[in-house]
Amino acid sequence: MNGQKDVVQVSEAWQTLSTYLPPVTADRDYWWQLTGRHVAALVEAAGYPIEKQYEALIFHYHWTVPYMGPAPKADGTPATWKSLLGLDGSPIEYSWKWNTTRSEPDVRYVTEPIGQHPGSHLDPLNQHALRELLQRFSKNMPSSDMNMSWVNHFFARLYDHDNTRYIQEAAAGSSRSTATSVQLGTEFLRRGIGFKTYFFPRKLGQVDDISISQYGASMSQLDVDETSWDARKALVEFLETNPEGKSLRPFSLAVDNVAPSQSRLKWYFHTLHTSIDSVREIMTLGGRINGIDKQLEELEDLIRVVAGLASDFPTNAEIPLPKKSDVYDQSAKDNFGELEDVLTGYLYYFDIAPGQGKLPEVKWFIPSRHYGPNDRELASALGAWMEARGRGAYNEPYMKMLHTLSAHRGLGDGKGLQTFISCLFKPSGDLDITTYLGAEAFHPGRVAKMAKPNGRSPRATLRRGDD
């Protein structure tokens, strides 16, 4: 991976579709030219069959791009709505679930669909677009593939429904009152496309995130047997009694858009604790989850690789971060406002779906955008970790894909394209490793490269019959 040059390659599927799919509007054409290339590079690098590459791109063109909002303004900043998905306000984040010795990579992305009136009295929390999109999915897809029961439940329970008061709180200085509150996950799996809905609760009069008990109340109102909540009960006990558990702060909930009996219920938390010992304590739920010593050793090694730690770095020490000016700019600080703390520390989720087991599944996230001198070196270090474990088959395709995503800048010229790296322990003993990738849609280099004298993307002036 170290010797790979910054050469951008174009996939066959992208070349074909970009030639024949008709242009629509300047805004949609901009997002298609940018993110369509990214999706094409991801699914090709992951080794998807050509028909699955076309499926992902056609889905992206017809279902995702129309909800990405206006193209950037002339100065390269978001025109109407700054999503909290990216530090710069990008409304999309990709993910690359790494191969194991027995499996191929999977590609996913998360978007924040942007409506016609985000942040206004009509739609203060920018939820209309996502709800419209889900309704359209429900009409066009088999009921076995799309179920809205839990989605509708949490929409009703995790938000207040007084738009005027949200706007009043925003006018009084609360940036959270008109900020990202829902996101849509799209999984391009080889067996088909799946969806998840992410909720970021907003309650009037609360500056901080809602409490554990408020989340608990919303879950308790689900139509499930109370005796099936073993995993949730074990987690809450850990949160209430363990020092590391007490450091965790909830900020989101996510469900699969399938029948409740098949859905995960992922509860997301943030902590400022970053020591290796704290990771061990949380991944084992304070010793409740056992038999994972080998996986913990592998995870410790991964942390040292990603964070650039020496082999003798103490396991009880907090991992140092670079200065904030090195990891995000003023626009990101303005964008996140009261949520600034979540830009550092670790994230975890716990799958506490009722009836799925006595203990939750735990996933750890490190904000990899903070670490390493640049994106190339971070990718090379992670690739070496994969290679040492017999998982290096996709290292070169991954690096080529990164070059496509970073066409606006060299991989060695900065960091932040690889936003997070996560780890989940599988019953097989494998570590599920995922790298999350930012679009950097509003990066100055990106806008300069895409811009034309008329302010439109290259396809925006072409219409049917103009040949």
Swiss-Prot record:
Pathway: Secondary metabolite biosynthesis. Disruption phenotype: Completely abolishes the production of pestalotiollide B. Its EC number is 2.5.1.-. Coiled coil: none annotated. One of its GO terms (biological process) is alkaloid metabolic process. Pfam families: Trp_DMAT. Dimethylallyl diphosphate binds at residues 108, 196, 198, 266, 268, 436. It is an enzyme of class 2 (transferase). Keywords: Transferase. L-tryptophan binds at residue 93. Prenyltransferase; part of the gene cluster that mediates the biosynthesis of dibenzodioxocinones such as pestalotiollide B, a novel class of inhibitors against cholesterol ester transfer protein (CEPT). The biosynthesis initiates from condensation of acetate and malonate units catalyzed by the non-reducing PKS pks8/GME11356. Pks8/GME11356 lacks a thioesterase (TE) domain, which is important to the cyclizing of the third ring of atrochrysone carboxylic acid, and the esterase GME11355 might play the role of TE and catalyzes the cyclization reaction of the C ring. Belongs to the tryptophan dimethylallyltransferase family. PANTHER family: INDOLE PRENYLTRANSFERASE TDIB-RELATED (PTHR40627), PRENYLTRANSFERASE ASQH1-RELATED (PTHR40627:SF4). This is Prenyltransferase GME11375.
